[in-house]
């Protein structure tokens, strides 16, 4: 949600997007995902083809274009551009680029300040991998970017493609907590001496309990698929 909110140019967003959300409840959950190591704003086009298999066919998240708009009853031109490929060139000229970590940081800090910092910033992964720089830096640059954003808890997706050693090295400099309930060590990994987190042989903690504004909040990690 935080990433989608950054799709507009400052001139458009300053007059057309209201970020003055009234606080409710004990805390605020802020979620970002799939920034793919893109630190600068960029043009992004949703796919015009997505094929679900079996019972997932023609079901979210495997519906696109007009089917998606009809399924969720979306008639906003802005959301149409954010979530589909329809009339991309036309709307891209109007709304500008997506994302950008400076934009994200500004928005996240605003959303936190509205609730006296009683908030958790969650990251669904696909964050540390995806750019030429992150490839050269083995994702370390993006770990540092995550720390600057103030990510509290994240799970993984393409972060694992750097390999076990680099991934674990990156976790050492990550200031947040990494959780993944669906990743366990294989017999081969155990034989080679890699230590599991618990008796169920989890690679990392499956969940974590955070105490925010007097409330206990459980965050369960679900790595790919369906992060």
Residues covered by each model-derived region:
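N-terminal catalytic scaffold of extracellular/periplasmic and nuclease hydrolases
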Residues: 4-227
């Amino acid at each position: 949600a935080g990433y989608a909110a950054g799709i507009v140019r400052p001139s458009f967003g300053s007059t057309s997007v209201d970020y003055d959300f009234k606080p409710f409840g004990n805390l605020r959950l802020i979620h970002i995902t799939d920034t793919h190591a893109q630190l600068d704003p960029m043009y992004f086009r949703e796919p015009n083809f997505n094929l679900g298999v079996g019972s997932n066919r023609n079901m979210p998240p495997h519906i696109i274009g007009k089917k998606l708009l009809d399924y969720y009853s979306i008639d906003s031109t802005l959301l149409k551009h954010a979530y589909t490929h329809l009339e991309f060139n036309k709307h891209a000229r109007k709304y500008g680029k997506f994302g950008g970590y400076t934009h994200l940081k500004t928005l996240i800090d605003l959303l936190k300040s509205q609730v006296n910092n009683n908030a958790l910033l969650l990251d669904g992964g696909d964050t540390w991998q995806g750019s030429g720089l992150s490839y050269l830096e083995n994702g370390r640059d993006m770990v540092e970017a995550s720390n600057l954003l103030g990510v509290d808890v994240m799970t993984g997706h393409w972060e694992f493609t750097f390999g076990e050693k680099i991934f674990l090295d990156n976790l050492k400099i990550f200031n947040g907590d990494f959780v993944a309930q669906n990743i366990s060590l294989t017999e081969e990994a155990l034989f080679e001496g890699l230590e599991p987190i618990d008796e169920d042989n989890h690679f990392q903690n499956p969940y974590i309990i955070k105490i925010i504004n007097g409330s206990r909040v459980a965050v369960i990690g679900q790595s790919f698929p369906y992060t």
